[in-house]
Amino acid sequence: RAFEFTNRGDFAHEVFAEVVKFAAKECPDMAMGVGSVVDAPTASLYIQLGACFVVGPLFNPDVAKVCNRRLIPYTPGCGSVTEVGMAQEVGCDLCKVFPGDVLGPNFVKGLKAPMPWSLIMVTGGVSPDADNIASWIKAGANCVGMGSKLFPKATIAAGDWKAVSDKCRESLEYVAKARESK
């Protein structure tokens, strides 16, 4: 299991430090990482606080250097075949297609045609429904990431953790089913 903490808002790094401590005790098998990282100093800070992986909305070679030095996987956001290629050249195994809802499944399919070795995660506009998830997996995405559509504010505010768990479980089932029919 992996969980990406979004680096957004004042004192986000302090909240992350507490979440890492909680996860180490309550979910020791879960990899805690950080997302929305755009520069090397931010990557360094979160790595020092315990991030097991770093995700960004864009590709920054300086973030790749920091992560490579500490053997921390870096998944940069890429919006073109060129960006994916450049990210792979500096050691990024998994590249994030972002924003997915703008680029679409055909972008992933087109990318994988000349670069079938590419490992692709799609975020931004992925929704926890069977058709949406299947469209990405069938296009060649290796995995998808979801945020507010998987964790709606109203559900979180109500403390309805069963609904969150159910939606996560359903989404994983949709991924498995899409992979089987691929």
Task: Give the residues covered by each predicted segment.
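Hydrophobic faces of well-ordered beta-strands that scaffold small-molecule active sites
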Residues: 1-5, 30-36, 54-55, 74-77, ...
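Active-site-adjacent beta->alpha loops and helix N-cap segments on the catalytic face
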Residues: 5-24, 39-44, 54-88, 97-116, ...
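Glycine/small-residue-rich phosphate/adenosyl-binding loop
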Residues: 51
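Short glycine/proline-rich, acidic loop/turn segments that cap or connect secondary-structure elements
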Residues: 134-148
